Amino acid sequence: MIGTIAVLVIAILVIFAFKKSPSNIPPIVETIPFIGCFYQFAKNPLQLVRNSYDRLGEIFTLHLMGFKMTFVLGPEAQALFFRGTDEELSPKEAYRFVTPVFGKGVVYDSETEIMYEQLRFVKNGLVLSQLKKAVGIIQEETEKYFETKWGDSGEIDLLYEMNKLTILTASRCLMGKSINKSLGQSGQLADLYHELEEGLNPISFFFPNLPLPSFKKRDAARAKVAAIFHSIIQERRRSTDDSVDDVLYTLMNSKYKDGSVLEDEQIVGLMIGLLFAGQHTSSITLTYTIFYLLNNLEYFDETQKDINDIVQKENQGEINFDGLKRMNRLETVIREVLRLHPPLIFLMRKVMTPMEYKGKTIPAGHILAVSPQVGMRLPTVYKNPDSFEPKRFDVEDKTPFSFIAFGGGKHGCPGENFGILQIKTIWTVLSTKYNLEVGPVPPTDFTSLVAGPKGPCMVKYSKKQK
């Protein structure tokens, strides 16, 4: 009996392995029947995608434990992804695995119309007037942090420090001084967000609720963050101070089209998601920016000249929005860092209706994906793609969907301007106050869906003499 079953299983696997697929679907990368290339994907997803591109070209499909993930790479192919309609491509269906972090009824776990209304509320809280006010807040918190935590000299893990500093400054901008009263500069929020980040990895995309240690830590961290944010919301409701105007205020006073207001749990989820999306991008990009600048003194000197001319000479030491916008070299450096090291290695949508690309049909049910990390390092898109050359951005690249670090189309990142502003402000304060010594640019850790430098990223610092 057992022998008969074994023969049947082997026969099914053989049929699976040699079964021909329709000729008009994208070429398939498949190694083991049913399992496919899941092991390679879990171990090093970027290497698998890049190798598949080199072998199969701009469109191909990975078989992953019953999931089919079709990648489109290069500006022309990526246009299919970014220009797809909601009827064709659903971000909501692709990103349900983030529900343990964002929460129920928030963004990707809500109906499509509700999701777009929630995203509109967030954008309303990040308008120009808020960005201008944010500069002073970021400067104040950054200076206070260095004075209380760094002192005159020492050695630190830069990524760890920038994680704490970016979430400290972002949370103050988004939620006001209440967050300081709750946490001060303890770094607790950064540590909790690190646990959330560790709970989003390639395995979580397929099985987000497995009883894994990293997922248990993620869920515990989420509960603690939610409790902190709930207490801040309750304090805000009790307050009689009507001068507060931040993103939290915007969310608490927003209404859906039917006239209903956001529930506190939805506000908490949106704040968690907004901070999560911005914090890891900013801290990773800021860390890499500092390493690249100090390993490329030509660009370091140019950015310092801008800071000296704009901040010190013209504005008598004041950092403001208009001055930061004029720091063009620093902006090109940040964009080049994002091209080389985009924190989000994959962007995904679920295919709802079959889609065509150059004679190939992508069936409904597939996950359609682009990889900023692979797509922005193609030699057909950027000359010397693995080299750090910020001057390539001195002239605007008008090729649609060649630079996709912030996504593209109607699903572009709403916090792009805030993130760049935050990085510029922190670097301006840091480079004005301290001399830094760094080693080579660290490699990237691709074991998480949020890819940052492999730590520790040790940096020596000493306060500049006035």
From Swiss-Prot:
It catalyses: a 14alpha-methyl steroid + 3 reduced [NADPH--hemoprotein reductase] + 3 O2 = a Delta(14) steroid + formate + 3 oxidized [NADPH--hemoprotein reductase] + 4 H2O + 4 H(+); a 14alpha-methyl steroid + reduced [NADPH--hemoprotein reductase] + O2 = a 14alpha-hydroxymethyl steroid + oxidized [NADPH--hemoprotein reductase] + H2O + H(+); a 14alpha-hydroxymethyl steroid + reduced [NADPH--hemoprotein reductase] + O2 = a 14alpha-formyl steroid + oxidized [NADPH--hemoprotein reductase] + 2 H2O + H(+); a 14alpha-formyl steroid + reduced [NADPH--hemoprotein reductase] + O2 = a Delta(14) steroid + formate + oxidized [NADPH--hemoprotein reductase] + H2O + 2 H(+). The keyword Metal-binding applies. It is found in: Membrane. One of its GO terms (biological process) is response to imidacloprid. Transmembrane segments: none annotated. Pathway: Steroid biosynthesis; zymosterol biosynthesis; zymosterol from lanosterol: step 1/6. InterPro entries: CYP450_sterol_14alpha_dmase (IPR050529), Cyt_P450 (IPR001128), Cyt_P450_CS (IPR017972), Cyt_P450_E_grp-IV (IPR002403), Cyt_P450_sf (IPR036396). One of its GO terms (cellular component) is membrane. Its cofactor is heme. It is an enzyme of class 1 (oxidoreductase). Heme binds at residue 413. Gene3D superfamilies: Cytochrome P450. The keyword Iron applies. One of its GO terms (molecular function) is iron ion binding. Its EC number is 1.14.14.154. Its main location: membrane. Keywords: Heme, Iron, Lipid biosynthesis, Lipid metabolism, Membrane, Metal-binding, Monooxygenase, Oxidoreductase, Steroid biosynthesis, Steroid metabolism, Sterol biosynthesis, Sterol metabolism. Belongs to the cytochrome P450 family. This is Probable lanosterol 14-alpha demethylase. It comes from Dictyostelium discoideum. The lineage of its organism: Eukaryota, Amoebozoa, Evosea, Eumycetozoa, Dictyostelia. The gene is cyp51.
